[in-house]
UniProtKB/Swiss-Prot annotation:
HAMAP family: Phosphoketolase (MF_01403). One of its GO terms (biological process) is carbohydrate metabolic process. Keywords: Lyase, Thiamine pyrophosphate. GO terms for molecular function: aldehyde-lyase activity. This is Probable phosphoketolase. It comes from Rhodopirellula baltica (strain DSM 10527 / NCIMB 13988 / SH1). Its cofactor is thiamine diphosphate. Belongs to the XFP family. The keyword Nucleotide-binding does not apply. The lineage of its organism: Bacteria, Pseudomonadati, Planctomycetota, Planctomycetia, Pirellulales.
């Protein structure tokens, strides 16, 4: 068993300074939770000095203050480039207090000055209407991770250090957070880190023993088991355990010196000798009481060191005078008169513990990654165009075409190493195999003879954990780089809530002038619902789009290009954009190609448009509008149009294709939305619209419910019918196929009369023929497999 480190070479005077800094941060943290006035306790505390609504989380806060104070010492001593990630981000008082003490907070918010008046404002704003949230939110300098939803701190930290060889991320992992699936998996991220070209993550597992009302698992297994667990993950654990402050200061100082020494030794060896074999990186296990230095007992019940200290220990001072008395005793226990001068400023000899300038963790430019953002070098997407010999000519698969474009983005940006591709073992499966012409999968575990495209250095990161891919990419973007997440459409749902949190982050940071814009989070969703016939029902779910459009209109964008040239145009736009979440849904299987590159670029720029060549309308309104959004819905719509034009030649048809889904919303609801007049010009004011949609049909109704002609919009899409079957049968099961679309049009056009009814009967016969054929032959009918668009239609 590893002994707790207690001896240290750090001077006793320095340890006393660290203790004073820690006490100052604790004082400011308690003040944020409780005080609305009397910030320096220049008079006895009165109930009028206490906030009427007490919010916040004390339990994790003193431990994080302890860590931050010690990191300040080691940053300054070793001139480290370091940022801080608060996994248990509900300890927001700690991050705010420390950035205030180091001065970075007041530089961004000058009205929160480093004096008594500023301190009062600091206290009042915390968890207060019109103030700041209780977590390590975007409003807090130095934060790249809010820590509200637990589990992503290590993933974000590793994303931050990829291609940042001089950066160290001190990542505090809460022992409650450590029970989440994403965090438990994230320990394996060390198998992807290259010590020669990447930075380092220093995890600090904070064992304070409790969650809201339960003990934590890692705090209740024995020392040896915990040590073996961390070693099994590939880490070298350094234990700091106890509750006596001065002994703990000594132990923590030595632990950090050992850890930083090991990191530097690992990196120096890799960079000087070329040895990139996987090292055992250090990590620290800090075991300290929950609610450390807070009230020992509250109302006769033990508080410090128990789950009772998780939030606000003394929660009712208005009704309980003893609580008010304890709050004052608690605040005065930090001896603020020793820490702050009469004006409320941290005494200089204590303030000198912290680094200065950009070395302060609250001012480090990596924590405001837009400051470091360098635009990608982009090839001309037009150079990858698919030549259109005729409308609907067969392509090789849209993502396979785009893979060559992305390959060259990798190549062009190799010098600056600021672009990466992330995916859960699906980069080849999703059609992006061309990228491996110029790069490898970065991998630092064992490599055996038959492995392909694995190397210690590469621009592709693949781990069969959507959580890690998403977290790595977010950390990479937040620190000023660019990336792409490719994923099966159905399984991107695994990161629904991670997307939610990132979209919230972008929303808030877009409202903070000091936060620079970062590159957009780009999803490429391939292997989609309509071509998962071979994997079955579990792999068929287009509902991520429903999740995405819930977020703020200023943040989210959704694109469904109908062919390869459109996909190239869309990807070029998305990879150049900043501060959005872009979701692109595209197919990987051979499919018809509709538009020349010039047409595709113009169509995608508009986001929606009439395909004149597909319809046959005259200058007046058509009899029916056939609309489509998505590659397979476009195919089925055009096949339906060809049937209608052949059998009902007098019927006038307009074909509308949608690439940018948000064009369907009113302009008042989304920046990309069409005005009512423009929408009516496309979809008419009173004609029936048969709309073939890639995802769940009610999403279109939701986006168009305010439109003049909404009552006449009839949407077909995925309605949760699926199995292992043929590609075309997937559309039949969901009434999205060409035969159903033809019948949908006829049902709403009584003027087609007997000819229409005979055509409807033919379509019903075709559906029976289809079912019989696939049941006998196991594949689609030749007229489906070999269908081609004809200009004569």
């Amino acid at each position: 068993m590893i002994e707790t480190l207690e001896s240290t070479q750090v001077s006793h005077e320095t340890l006393r300074t660290i203790d004073a800094y820690w006490r100052a941060a604790n004082y400011l943290s308690v003040g944020q939770i409780y005080l609305s006035d009397n910030p320096l306790l220049k008079r006895p505390l009165r109930i009028e000095d206490v906030k009427k609504m007490l919010l916040g989380h004390w339990g994790t806060t003193p431990g994080q203050n302890f860590i931050y104070a010690h990191l300040n010492r080691t940053i300054k001593q070793n001139d480290l480039n370091m940022i801080y990630v608060s996994g248990p981000g509900h300890g927001g008082p700690a991050v705010v207090a420390n950035t205030y003490l180091e001065g970075s907070y007041s530089e961004i918010y000058p009205h929160i000055s480093q004096d008594e008046a500023g301190m009062r404002k600091l206290f009042v704003q915390f968890s207060f209407p019109g103030g700041i949230p209780s977590h390590a939110s975007p409003e807090c300098p130095g934060s790249i991770h809010e820590g509200g939803e637990l589990g992503y701190s290590l993933s974000h930290s590793f994303g931050a250090v990829f291609d940042n060889p001089d950066l160290i991320v001190a990542c505090v992992v809460g022992d409650g957070e450590a029970e989440t699936g994403p965090l438990a998996t994230a320990w394996h991220s060390n198998k992807f880190l290259n010590p020669a070209t990447d930075g380092a993550v220093l995890p600090i597992l904070h064992l304070n023993g409790f969650k809201i009302a339960n003990p934590t698992i890692l705090a209740r297994i024995n020392h040896e088991e915990l040590e073996q667990l961390m070693r099994g993950y590939g880490w070298t654990p350094i234990f700091v355990e106890g509750k006596d402050p001065m002994k703990m200061h000594a132990a923590m100082a030595e632990a950090l010196d050992v850890a930083i020494g090991q990191i530097r030794s690992i990196q120096q060896n890799a960079r000087e000798t070329g040895d990139t074999s996987r090292p055992r990186w250090p990590m620290i296990v800090l075991r300290s009481p929950k609610g450390w230095t807070g009230p020992k007992f509250v109302d006769g019940v033990r508080n410090e060191g128990t789950f009772h200290s998780h939030q606000v220990p003394l929660s009712d001072p208005a009704k309980c005078p003893e609580h008010l008395k304890q709050i004052e005793q608690w605040l005065r226990s930090y001896r603020p008169e020793e820490l702050l001068d009469e004006n409320g400023r941290l005494r200089q000899e204590i303030a000198d513990l912290a680094p200065t300038g950009d070395r302060r963790m609250g001012a480090n430019p990596h924590a405001n990654g837009g400051r470091l953002l360098r635009r990608l070098k982009m090839p001309d997407f037009r150079d990858y165009a698919v030549e259109i010999s005729q409308r609907g000519c067969r392509g090789i698969g849209d993502t396979h075409v785009t893979g060559k474009f992305i390959r060259d983005i990798v190549r062009l940006n190799e010098e600056h190493k600021n672009f990466r591709i992330f995916g859960p073992d699906e980069t080849i499966s999703n059609g992006l195999e061309a990228v491996f012409d110029v790069t490898q999968r970065q991998w630092n575990a064992a490599i055996v003879e038959d492995d392909e495209s694995l190397a210690p250095t590469g621009r592709v990161l693949e781990m069969l954990s959507e959580h890690q891919c998403e977290g790595w990419l977010e950390g990479y973007l937040l620190t000023g780089r660019h990336g792409l997440f490719n994923c099966y459409e159905a399984f991107v749902h695994i990161v629904d809530s991670m997307f939610n949190q990132h979209a919230k982050w972008l929303k808030v940071t877009s409202e903070l002038p000091w936060r620079h814009k970062i590159a957009s989070l780009n999803y490429l969703l391939a292997s989609h619902v309509w071509r998962q016939d071979h994997n079955g029902f579990t792999h068929q779910d287009p509902g991520f789009l429903d999740v995405v459009v819930n977020k703020k209109a200023e943040i989210v964008r959704v694109y469904l290009p109908p062919d390869a040239n459109c996909l190239l145009s869309v990807m070029d736009h998305c990879l150049r954009s900043q501060h959005y979440v872009n979701v692109v849904v595209a197919g990987k299987h051979p499919s018809p190609q509709w538009l020349t590159m010039g047409e595709a670029a113009e169509h995608c720029a508009k986001g929606i448009g009439i395909w004149d060549w597909a319809g046959n309308e005259s200058s007046s309104d058509p009899d029916v509008v056939m609309a489509c959004c998505g590659d397979v819905p476009t195919l089925e719509t055009l096949a339906a149009v060809s049937i209608l034009r052949e059998h009902l030649p007098d019927l006038t048809i307009r074909v509308v294709n949608v690439v940018d889904l948000m064009r369907l919303q009113p302009k008042s609801e989304h920046p990309h939305g069409l005005s009512d007049s423009d929408f009516d010009a496309l979809f008419t004011k009173n004609k029936h619209v048969i709309f073939a949609f890639h995802a769940y049909p009610w999403l279109v109704h939701r986006l168009t419910y305010r439109r003049t002609n909404h009552a006449n919009i009839h949407v077909r899409g995925y309605k949760e019918e699926g199995t292992i079957t043929t590609p075309f049968d997937m559309t039949v099961l969901n009434d999205l196929d060409r035969f159903h679309l033809v019948m949908d049009a006829i049902d709403r056009l009584p003027e087609t009369g007997g000819r229409g009814q005979r055509l409807k009967a033919l379509m019903q016969e075709k559906l029976v023929e289809h079912r019989r054929y696939i049941n006998e032959n196991g594949q689609d009918m030749p007229e489906i497999r070999d269908w081609e668009w004809s200009a004569r239609s």
